[in-house]
Amino acid sequence: MLKSDVWFATIDELSPEIRSGRLSSVELTKGFLDRIDKFSARFNAFEHPTPDLALDQAARVDSDLKANHWRGPLHGIPYAAKDLFDTRSVPTAWGTKFLRDRVPDENATVIDRLEAAGAVLLGKTAMVEFAGCLGYRFANASATGPGRNPWDPSRWTGGSSSGSGAAVAGGLATFALGTETWGSILCPSAFCGLTGIRPTYGLVSRAGGMVGAYTFDKVGPLAHSVSDCRTVLAAIAGADPRDPSCATEKTKLDRGAGKQWRNLHAALVPLDWKKVGEPEVKSAFDAAVAELSAAGVRIDDTPLPDVPATEVSGLLIGMEALAAFDPFLADGRVKQLVDDMAPRQLELGQIVTGPDVTKALRIREAIQREMREFFMRFDVIVTPNFMSVAPPVEQDLNESLPYGDPVGALAAACGLPGLALPAGRGKAGMPVSFQVVAAPFDDATLLDLGDLYQARTQFHRAHPALA
């Protein structure tokens, strides 16, 4: 019988156990598969569990270990992947009901890279339809129903990587892959009390994955610690001829590769907490800022550039999604989506003109210039992920989260990396989170700063008690 703490253990904790032979990947994988059978439906975590594949991969890496072939820290570690990454001979439905018979012939690049690193795929996690690129108003905009938060199943996981958040927070996988166009990694990380990184645009290949907004979409992990995020990111990052958007130069992600934290200058975004924020979230966020300050980070209140990032990101994402999903509009299948906002968005997109898009692209370039200048004065931005905890699953998200992520639109427009860090508990005992955001390809600074914070706090070790 495996100890209960393995379900919420980090890669750093599990890896030595597997390498030493004290724990086999098959044993660990069987345990996670049992938990998926027991808990997945409660949280709408998995769309397609892959028990046969998982046990085959686990047996293979155990055999490798007996032959003294150690693949690295992910050797034998069970994980889950958002159901928009192609997986050979496994259905990949992009969060929809009408694509459930779609079975790819090959793997996405990130799936191949994780397999090469020795990780074991437990299955494909549920997600918001088309990753939310067409917009959605309700948490149930998914083939599996709303993502239910393991901390309280009456509340949302966040999206669009809803199942990835539920799987890791519920102890159904050690880590999970998510994607983000605008908030889809950091949101479920925040609401589920996880550590998650949205890498710089172009750092990780999207080849073999659903790409709804080509110049916005990123791939990254949700995990139990910054160190785990670093390990996974190092395994999946890098140039890929299958994805022309990938950076060709290698980005250093090793510990200490970022800017020295003692010299970091952080911009603290002023927010109107009296208007929209929850006091418990503010208290937890203030304590996190104080912790960073005590560690030596210089923090100054500074507003973000006053630019129309929300409007520009919204228009361009909509147009790119229209191009990506046009076949489903043409054949009428878009009307089968659960949330009625998506087909209306596609129809509205058809009235946007070429000059509208050209203007938006020019404004986006200006926004990116503004942010390059901003990061000449500051190394990172510090802000809450949200000013409230996870909302009830039945609420209209436009009403329960009217202000969203304070820096989400800017980060989307500029391809900025961001790191979500657990910061305690708020209303109804739900997780509170904050984020640090850096300039493009300064992901290592975020990881180093996150390591510093998690060395001084234990919020990332908290997990829900499941029975």
Residue ranges of model-derived segments:
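Short glycine/serine-rich loop segments
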Residues: 106-236, 412-435
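Acyltransferase
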Residues: 22-33, 59-62, 279-303, 325-335, ...
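A short helix-breaking turn/cap at a secondary-structure junction
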Residues: 198-283, 456-467
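Glycine/threonine-rich flexible loop motifs
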Residues: 92-101, 278-279, 391-400
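An N-terminal boundary/leader segment
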Residues: 1-57, 294-296, 351, 462-467
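Glycine-rich, small-residue loops and helix-cap segments
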Residues: 21, 76, 116, 120, ...
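Acidic/His- and Gly-rich active-site-bordering loop/insert found
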Residues: 64, 68-140
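Short helix-loop capping/hinge segments that flank enzyme active sites or metal/cofactor-binding pockets
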Residues: 75-94, 260-270, 318-372, 420-431
